[in-house]
Amino acid sequence: MAKMRISPELKKLIEKYRCVKDTEGMSPAKVYKLVGENENLYLKMTDSRYKGTTYDVEREKDMMLWLEGKLPVPKVLHFERHDGWSNLLMSEADGVLCSEEYEDEQSPEKIIELYAECIRLFHSIDISDCPYTNSLDSRLAELDYLLNNDLADVDCENWEEDTPFKDPRELYDFLKTEKPEEELVFSHGDLGDSNIFVKDGKVSGFIDLGRSGRADKWYDIAFCVRSIREDIGEEQYVELFFDLLGIKPDWEKIKYYILLDELF
């Protein structure tokens, strides 16, 4: 804790907690679990290079405050900008991570049901006063900034096997040229079983909300399709997912949004 760039006020708030660094996440944010006698908290930190991007925890703070009463999200306890860092202190989400509660091989139908429940929840939210719009224009402008400042995920070895591009700029050019029409709804922006909490068989919480906001309805759906294929692996469960949603898949959009995520 001594090496953290935090204010005296924040240090006082967390001094009685045992600090454990999270090593699971893939984002550039630093995340710490703060273990207390009666409760656990989380501290999430991003440096100034990410200010204004979807990685910026100030953006996540704004969305968490806006989502209060709309979705089950952690409570914002403290936010600050200090010594070149943005620091967000929040409560622990209620329930257990979906990825820990349900094994992909043992409970595939339940996981599909939860994904469909999430999509229905998101699409029911009124976005008229949502503070952020993650339209393709804004995401591609962000991606251009990240690429120009060596902040994008450019490890091509981690790309999907069928991604037909040689380098990040070639993929970026394709994404910019082939933008689909958008139908804006509320979107989580990074939906998967490691960002969903469950309790008594129902969705009980969401975390990692920095990319949430207005976005095309197929954005989160594409993430669900990718997760189902990678984690469960049987196409019948993709079909079940769309049956539960009561819609037909738009495969062009699904492919596009999976490609977009290759660089984040």
Swiss-Prot record:
Residues spanning the membrane: none
Catalytic site: 190
InterPro entries linked: AGP_Transferase, Aminoglycoside_PTrfase, Kan/Strep_kinase, Kinase-like_dom_sf
Superkingdom as given in the UniProt entry: Bacteria
Pfam families xref list: APH
EC number: 2.7.1.95
Catalytic activity line of the entry: kanamycin A + ATP = kanamycin 3'-phosphate + ADP + H(+)
GO terms, biological process: response to antibiotic
Leading EC class: transferase
Gene Ontology molecular function, alphabetical: ATP binding; kanamycin kinase activity
Membership in a protein family: Belongs to the aminoglycoside phosphotransferase family.
Main function: Resistance to kanamycin and structurally-related aminoglycosides, including amikacin.
UniProt-recorded name of the protein: Aminoglycoside 3'-phosphotransferase
Organism this protein belongs to: Enterococcus faecalis (Streptococcus faecalis)
Gene: aphA
